[in-house]
Regions:
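N-terminal regions of ATP-driven nucleic-acid and macromolecular assemblies
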Residues: 1-164
């Protein structure tokens, strides 16, 4: 992983089993793609998280199609994280952009992680934006409580452009 490694403690807090995690580090994107294909061919793999920096030439439409077919054949969910890359054609079923959001911290803890997720591509349609909060106790995402919201003004539109 270019941006660090999965933290066993963090994975445990999110409801995962750190002992079930296998991390593979490669020297370059081509080796990472080869390792991903090997992993997708293994039985008993729950998911694959492949992280690639930028837009390497080896990750073209053909390579993404091969990954997609291997994942479909094995039944393994494959995630491709691309840091510092522009959107480009791929064989992915979906494309998401995920950003962090402020969590609702309480006096006794940091609060659970909250994300803004945008589904930017889906072969079957149905694009949209979602706010989601991770609930580690139930190991699922929930709609975050955004707290108090100011009522819209009755005498004017809620959003008003102001000339400066």
């Amino acid at each position: 992983m270019e941006y660090g490694a999965c933290s066993p403690n963090g994975l445990l807090e999110l409801g995962g089993d750190p002992q079930a995690l296998i991390q593979v580090r490669t020297r370059n994107a081509a080796d990472a793609l080869a390792a991903a294909h090997d992993i997708l061919a293994c039985p008993h793999v729950g998911a694959l998280l492949l992280e690639i920096e930028g837009m390497p030439k080896c990750l073209d439409l053909v390579a993404s199609r091969r990954l997609s077919l291997a994942a479909a054949e094995s039944g393994v969910t494959a995630f491709l994280l691309r840091h510092g890359a522009q959107a480009q054609p791929s064989a992915a079923l979906t494309r998401w952009q995920v950003d962090s959001m402020p969590s609702q911290a309480k006096d006794d803890d940091w609060g659970n992680p909250v994300f803004a997720a945008q589904l930017t591509r889906h072969r079957a349609g149905g694009l949209g934006s979602f706010s989601m909060k991770w609930n580690p106790a139930n190991a699922c995402f929930e709609t975050p409580d955004i707290g108090a919201v100011v009522a819209a003004p009755a005498d004017r539109p809620a959003h008003q452009k102001i000339a400066i």
